[in-house]
Curated annotation (Swiss-Prot):
Gene3D superfamilies, per database record: DnaJ domain
UniProt cross-references to PROSITE patterns, sorted A to Z: DNAJ_1 (PS00636), DNAJ_2 (PS50076)
Protein name per its UniProtKB record: DnaJ homolog subfamily B member 7
Taxonomic lineage of the native organism: Eukaryota, Metazoa, Chordata, Craniata, Vertebrata
Sample GO molecular function, one term: Hsp70 protein binding
Residue span(s) of domain J: 3-69
Length: 312
């Protein structure tokens, strides 16, 4: 007998919001279009997920299910109903339920989460309500946000990272937001490959009519602007590059279930790259390019110091 609570992975006391969030996650996981090699099982699971949501999201139907199980919904348990009248529930098509929740938008596109991005950005604000500025800004763990909760265990239709012997290659897509919040999008295409046991990560972005590409393997290897090596940008990026990982205790977690995040500040692009070791890319909030002026002042200060030393 199918347990609808188990199908959605929720407790019996789950709230309507929990039910809807769980449906989004599991429905994306078992959507037949995402499982072409296992379509028969995916269709069965997808149908079960839709049925579970239809029952548990409705107060009356959920109450009948809790008391009499699925038989009560099918009418087979009618003799056990309080009012002794027959109650038969007809399930809708799984695709119709899916469209009701996700709308007509592409379910495997990051645009699916646009409506929840404002909440994601708000979650990274300070307690006083103002957003942090500059390199010290707080970047939230996006996968903890309800709208993106499904991304932690599987992607949204893009290929998962797989190492193919000594060389493996895959590509992912993500969005960067500038400091205005929702207004301007910068397309980012990170990719990764393994060469001789070393992880080589490449990130490309097109902004202000310039294509910028950075390649690194924990140490920056190259920085290109419009496919041409740029020594100044390379030096700046090396100087301003830093990594920030979430708290991790080896005594309480294993490396297999702990996600480590890397924050790389790139003020030349006005963008902070946020990556983690389990998933190559997630949403990242951009910074204003005020850091560029700071670096310019810093360089001028260094030149003055050198000039003073020569004079002495």
């Amino acid at each position: 007998m199918v347990d609808y609570y188990e199908v959605l992975g929720v407790q019996r006391y789950a709230s309507p919001e929990d039910i809807k969030r769980a449906y989004r996650k599991v429905a994306l996981k078992w959507h037949p279009d995402k499982n072409p090699e296992n379509k028969e099982e995916a269709e069965r699971k997808f149908k079960e997920v839709a049925e579970a949501y239809e029952v548990l999201s409705n107060v009356e139907k959920r109450d009948i299910y809790d008391k009499y199980g699925k038989e009560g919904l099918d009418g087979r348990g009618a003799s056990h109903l309080d009012d002794e009248r027959e109650y038969r529930f007809t399930f809708r098509k799984a695709d119709d339920v899916f469209k009701e929740i996700f709308g007509e938008r592409d379910p495997f596109s990051f645009h699916l989460f646009e409506d929840s991005l404002e909440g994601l950005l708000n979650s990274s604000r300070s307690p006083s309500g103002s957003r942090g500025r500059g390199a010290g800004s707080h970047v939230s763990r996006a996968y903890d946000h309800p709208a993106l909760s499904g991304l932690s265990s599987y992607d949204t239709g893009y290929s998962s990272y797989v190492s193919l012997g000594h060389e493996g290659l895959t590509s992912f897509s993500s969005l960067a937001l500038d400091d205005s919040g929702m207004g301007n999008y910068i397309p980012i295409t990170p990719s990764g490959k393994v060469i001789n046991g070393r992880n080589i990560n490449t990130k490309k972005a097109f902004e202000n009519r310039q294509e910028r590409e950075a390649e690194d393997d924990s140490e920056l290897i190259s920085f290109l602007v419009n496919s041409v090596a740029n020594e100044e940008h390379f030096t700046d990026k090396c100087n301003w590059r830093r990594q920030s990982f979430n708290n991790y205790s080896p005594n309480s977690y294993s490396s297999s279930n702990t996600t480590q995040y890397t924050l790389v500040d790139n003020n030349e692009q006005g963008t902070s790259w946020v990556t983690n070791k389990k998933e190559p890319s997630i949403f990242s909030a951009g910074f204003k390019e005020g850091g560029r002026r700071k670096k310019k002042k810093h360089k001028e200060g260094q030149k003055k110091k050198k000039s003073n030393k020569r004079n002495h």
